[in-house]
Amino acid sequence: MKTGRIVKSISGVYQVDVNGERFNTKPRGLFRKKKFSPVVGDIVEFEVQNINEGYIHQVFERKNELKRPPVSNIDTLVIVMSAVEPNFSTQLLDRFLVIAHSYQLNARVLVTKKDKTPIEKQFEINELLKIYENIGYETEFIGNDDDRKKIVEAWPAGLIVLSGQSGVGKSTFLNHYRPELNLETNDISKSLNRGKHTTRHVELFERQNGYIADTPGFSALDFDHIDKDEIKDYFLELNRYGETCKFRNCNHIKEPNCNVKHQLEIGNIAQFRYDHYLQLFNEISNRKVRY
């Protein structure tokens, strides 16, 4: 038996990495009976049959899992936004952050296309990123001349997953980091201000102290797994200040003696962050139940 990590999955074949050696494996029939499928990122135990082939016997417990796209055991989720084409959006960023925290993922923010961004817009984005840094997020704003290898190797060890909407430059970023990957890229649609999907599956690529993965771009974000009363926990500053609200279940909207509303009034919480919280709270409160 060998133990390794699934780094690629295509048509029911799972490529497992064991210290740089790759094995094409398939899950035993037991998994089909349990209606359980391995995903990229899983740590598995498998039996070798023939050269570099085998059958998966066990999938070890996942510490976390992203549902769309399916990838597990993520150490850091890098939310990739572009400054322009498509334009930087704090609302979209906040939604990505909520998704990340709902899956217990550590998140950091990478903004691309600095070299294509007017100076005034660069200043505006830098000021917004300072707000996110004060909340507790690591952020970076990069252009075409920045050394991708230096950036990636400075990130935490383990599995790094790049996530973001289509067209923000995830595949381009990886091509600069590892030119031999030659990942497909596409220009954005001028009419829609968003990109076309070029990455169609998740694949892990080795880096100095772990792995890095590109993921298919999002055209929509799914909040079906999140309850309205959980959202406040995924806005980190609301969660922090909410600990001293009068009521433990305070949603920071109309409740009396709300510390979050007080911190908002004195400027310790950014108005746009609170507005995005309210929008998402109302959106989830009013969603229709799916049967």
Curated annotation (Swiss-Prot):
Domain of life: Bacteria
UniProt keyword terms in alphabetical order: Cytoplasm, GTP-binding, Hydrolase, Metal-binding, Nucleotide-binding, Ribosome biogenesis, RNA-binding, rRNA-binding, Zinc
Function according to Swiss-Prot or TrEMBL: One of several proteins that assist in the late maturation steps of the functional core of the 30S ribosomal subunit. Helps release RbfA from mature subunits. May play a role in the assembly of ribosomal proteins into the subunit. Circularly permuted GTPase that catalyzes slow GTP hydrolysis, GTPase activity is stimulated by the 30S ribosomal subunit.
A GO MF term: GTPase activity
Database matches in InterPro entries: G_CP_dom (IPR030378), NA-bd_OB-fold (IPR012340), P-loop_NTPase (IPR027417), Ribosome_biogen_GTPase_RsgA (IPR004881), RsgA_GTPase_dom (IPR010914), RsgA_N (IPR031944)
UniProt organism field: Staphylococcus aureus (strain N315)
Gene Ontology BP annotations: ribosomal small subunit biogenesis
Needed cofactors: Zn(2+)
Residue ranges constituting the CP-type G domain according to the UniProt record: 63-221
One Pfam family named in its UniProt record: RsgA_N
Subcellular compartments: Cytoplasm
Chain positions recorded as GTP binding sites: T112, K113, K114, D115, G164, Q165, S166, G167, V168, G169, K170, S171, T172
This protein's encoding gene: rsgA
Gene Ontology CC, one term: cytoplasm
UniProt keyword annotation of Nucleus present: no
Protein name in the entry: Small ribosomal subunit biogenesis GTPase RsgA
Subunit structure: Monomer. Associates with 30S ribosomal subunit, binds 16S rRNA.
